[in-house]
Swiss-Prot record:
PANTHER family: MALATE DEHYDROGENASE (PTHR23382). The record marks C72, C77 as: Activation of NADP-MDH. Disulfide bonds join C72-C77, C413-C425. Pfam families: Ldh_1_C, Ldh_1_N. NADP(+) binds at G101, A102, A103, G104, M105, I106, S107, N195, V219, G220, N221. This is Malate dehydrogenase [NADP], chloroplastic. The keyword Transmembrane helix does not apply.
Length: 437
């Protein structure tokens, strides 16, 4: 294992060479882009790199006079000759994945799935760019160390920073996990404003430096409205590229239907979560199927479907906290993987998946200009299309109207962050987000 420290005079070409395995820690924020307090000038940029198992390793050499070196950690002070690296010809072109909230519990599960090849495949090298805060920077360095110690051959580069403009540079995927949790006594309107400011800033950064076709998955709550804020602040990126994560809700719904029907959950298909990622979300049992049959033909207890099933899915996160003592992290990371793979692998014939997307032009009569979870299919090219062959009854329409009204009210609450005027906050009900205390 080798780690390298570079001083700030290194060229950009050195830092981004495709043949270099590097962990880059940029700890000096750009003041005009980042609202966080600046770090001390004594902190220096650092790089570390993982040596492939078949790589010839040259003796370690010092990069500068030891007396003039700043404090550094172990092998961060050393550099190795990596020119002997042998390229793997079957590998695809490297892709860049940015992750915010990278020192958190969800990321702690997710990053290792990404680095292992589980998500994008065994021949897809990746660069991870990890965004933290000034407070979490030390923990972020620990995350980078663990990634390095894991010797993932597909992981070619890791960048850590507190500046979104650095982390989102050339990003092809942006997984926005970081958000402030709802504290005791905090009104939902306050949470919308606090986190909305974070996602407005990140939207601007994506707009400025990310790939023009970057795919963005918003996980931080309230994820639907945070995704709307983000896309409104990124006009150069197609609105269709922004997603709010509702895949965990879909997975939970499939699990509950499978339990009730006495089958394994791979028999459940065509499951849609409609609307907001809150307790107004609508798990759709009308269009879902179990072993190819409509759910209502398999589960005859329709009262259970309308009452107990729906409530179980809506409140599953809170129930987990009561048992576990903390909100879901591992299952959330699994659902992020599922959400990504649904976009890069063709959807099985006749099936679909749920994701929160921009509603403008939707075929369901749902209000436009919000982010609403709907059924989608993909050809595996990172894009998607809305499913048109779904049916509605009065019960489903009534539930959709409630979650739609909530999202429209949230949109008014953040008008000052989307460039649509003065915020007017009159939420129809203080619904708890799944997983909140």
């Amino acid at each position: 294992m080798a780690l390298t420290q570079l001083n700030n005079t290194c060229s950009k070409t050195q830092l981004h060479s495709s043949s270099q395995l590097s962990f880059l820690s940029r700890t000096l924020p750009r003041h005009h882009h980042c609202t966080l307090a600046p770090l001390h000038r004594t902190q220096h940029a650092r790089i570390s790199c993982s040596v492939a198992p078949n790589q010839v390793q040259a003796p370690a050499v010092q990069t500068q006079d030891p007396k003039s070196k700043p404090d550094c950690y172990g092998v961060f002070c050393l550099t190795y000759d990596l020119k002997a690296e042998e390229e793997t010809k079957s590998w695809k072109k490297l892709i860049t994945i940015a992750v915010s909230g990278a020192a958190g519990m969800i990321s702690n599960h997710l990053l290792f799935k990404l680095a292992s090849g589980e998500v994008f495949g065994p021949n897809q090298p990746i660069a991870l760019k990890l965004l933290g805060s000034e407070r979490s920077l030390q923990a972020l360095e620990g995350v980078a160390m663990e990634l390095e110690d894991s010797l993932f051959p597909l992981l070619r580069e890791v960048v850590i920073s507190i500046d979104p403009y650095e982390v989102f540079q050339d990003a092809e995927w942006a997984l926005l996990i970081g958000a402030k949790p709802r504290g005791p006594g905090m009104e939902r309107a306050a949470l919308l404003d606090i986190n909305g400011q974070i996602f407005a800033e990140q939207g601007k950064a994506l707009n400025a430096v990310a790939s023009r076709n970057v795919k963005v998955i918003v996980v931080g709550n309230p994820c639907n409205t945070n995704a709307l804020i983000c896309l409104k602040n990124a006009p150069n990126i197609p609105a269709k590229n922004f997603h709010a994560l509702t895949r965990l809700d879909e997975n939970r719904a499939k699990c509950q239907l499978a339990l009730k029907a006495g089958v394994f959950y791979d028999k459940v298909s065509n499951m849609t979560i409609w609307g907001n990622h809150s307790t107004t979300q609508v798990p759709d049992f009308l269009n879902a199927r179990i072993d190819g049959l409509p759910v209502k033909e398999v589960i005859k207890d329709h009262k259970w479907l309308e009452e107990e099933f729906t409530e179980k899915v809506q409140k599953r996160g809170g129930a987990l906290i009561q048992k576990w003592g903390r909100s879901s992290a591992a299952s959330t990371s699994v659902s992020i993987v599922d959400a990504i793979r649904s976009l890069i692998i063709p959807t099985p014939e006749g099936d679909w998946f749920s994701t929160g997307v921009y509603t403008t032009g939707n075929p369901y009569g749902i209000a436009e200009d919000i982010v609403f979870s709907m059924p989608c299919r993909s050809k595996g090219d990172g894009d998607y299309e809305l499913v048109k062959d779904v049916i509605f009854d009065d019960y489903l329409r009534q539930k959709l109207a409630k979650t739609e009204a909530e999202l429209l009210a949230e949109k008014k609450c953040v008008a000052h962050l989307t460039g649509e005027g003065i915020a007017v906050c009159d939420l129809p009900g203080d619904t708890m987000l799944p997983g909140e205390m």
